[in-house]
């Protein structure tokens, strides 16, 4: 029961970032592999190769911020812990493992250093976590990584 409540809280936090940020970047080994952006009144989903060449573009017609948040949540759960999410315009709102990311207009990721991360919020944590800007709290993903998470 607690895992389910925690999952719902995480989805709520991610949805808040989707609504307030406008762009979400999904990173694997610090390389952007996907982007979800709100453009022209709908969500667009882009995928990229390692050189950041566009592989595909999809219009997510009819998708809501909650649908997008659930999609991002599922991506987090299914991917290794060294993957990261960037959200913002152009400030970082979600970050993992003390790594904080901004992007320039070419969507090249620029790693920021300690002085920047300390200005965003608490930056020392061991578990992969989401920092929710709405309720200004950390929500660790480790609470929901157990095999019986979906029971």
From Swiss-Prot:
Binds 1 Zn(2+) ion. GO terms for molecular function: metal ion binding. Its cofactor is Zn(2+). It comes from the Viruses. Induction: Expressed in the early phase of the viral replicative cycle. The keyword Cytoplasm does not apply. Transmembrane segments: none annotated. A motif (Thioredoxin WCTKC motif) lies at residues 131-135. Disulfide bonds: none annotated. Monomer. Homodimer. Interacts with protein B119L. Interacts with membrane protein E248R. Belongs to the asfivirus A151R family. This is Protein A151R. It comes from African swine fever virus (strain Badajoz 1971 Vero-adapted) (Ba71V).
